[in-house]
Structure formats: structure tokens, C-alpha cells
Amino acid sequence: MSEKKNLGHNTKKNFLNKPVEHIDITSFDSRDIISSMQKMSFVSRETGNAASIFNEMLKDKNCTIFLTLAGSTSAAGCMNIYKDMVKYNMVDAIVATGASIVDMDFFEGLGFKHYQGSQFQDDSELRKNYIDRIYDTYIDEDELQMCDKIICEIADKLPPKTYTSREFIYEMG
């Protein structure tokens, strides 16, 4: 396992200088490369096989497709993919972690960004700059706390009762 090190950034501005970009799957046709991956090895072959299975699921009118998400995939640049999968009726239901909805989607909906970083960066250097890390992605802790404050304000305005996740997300907008 690699040792963590200071990669020479040293200032918050230097750490947070490359926003993660969310891919637009409607801007290119990847079908040929994905299907050709079935003839490769390791994760490439599994990616090609998964795409083939997913295409069969889309053709089957009796198939219910669940998209399950972890928060880190949204931060990694997949939000537009999920949006387009819903828009083009490629999924029937989404099961997501709270982090996916709150700390990733809502966070970016407020105009904040996730930034490209390094999994090898010394976390103590990040901590000095008030930066959080999800593997190789950085988040400005000040912005994350602003997001949390807004969520608290939303919750504080609600009548006291038990809310389902769906009800609370609705209140978030």
C-alpha cells in the first residue's frame, strides 16, 4: 500500500483547483467500445457483459430495473448519468444512500463542487486546509458545513413528526 505524502499543493486554492466534471452520456456513442470490451479481460470484460445484460433488461417489458447508488459515485462525476437514466426511462427505481442525496447531489445543487485530488495525499495536510477526501476526490469542509446548516434550517422549519426519507427529500426541494 502506498504511503501518504504531501504532493506539494499546500494551500486550499491549490488543492481545490480542478472541479470534477460530470460526464454527458448523450454527447457521444460508446456502444461499439463497450460491446468490444466483452472480448477483453478483467473489469473490461465484466463491463461489456454488464452492458449486454442491461440492454436485455431494457428490452424486457416485464423487468423492473433498480439503480442502486453509493454517495461517492455522485461525487465522482456520475450525476448526469443518473439523471439521463431516469429521463430516458432506463431505470424504474433508485435506491440511494443518504450521502448520495444529501452530501453529494444537494451539495452540488447549492452550487458547491467536488474536486479532483489524489488518494495518496497526506490527510493531515488536507485537514490543515479544512478539506475532506473521498478516495481521490476533495470537498471543501466549509462548504459541506454550509450545506449541513441549510439542511438543518429546512428540518427546523418542519412540523415535529416522523418523516420518511421521501418526505424529507421532498422538503429539501
Regions found by a protein language model. Give the residues of each.
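Metallocofactor- and cofactor-centric catalytic cores in central/energy metabolism, strongly enriched
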Residues: S2-Q145, K149-Y163, E167-G173
